[in-house]
């Protein structure tokens, strides 16, 4: 899929071990497949973010895994149970992917699409207030 890659995101990914590069590149592709209008940026000096009408997700490589932070993940259904952390956080959730683990791309794409839809509807604060 063709998209405008932020060279700072490329630099971040290129500096990682091969197995983390592969994970980050796959998550990046999934984010752009979720909606062609998703853009990339870097926040907090080095952390890659995917945004569309608000934050959608961010990447952070750790020693033995890659974290995918889902913004407003607290109101996104997770029927396949791919979220691994953040259940005590009011809004964000996290998926940790370790070397050799398969990414559930269809489930992650659906989550990205739901977060984007929520962003377009005004974000989690507006959606929670309406409940």
What are these regions (language model features)?
Residues 1-131:
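Charge-dense, helix-prone N-terminal extensions
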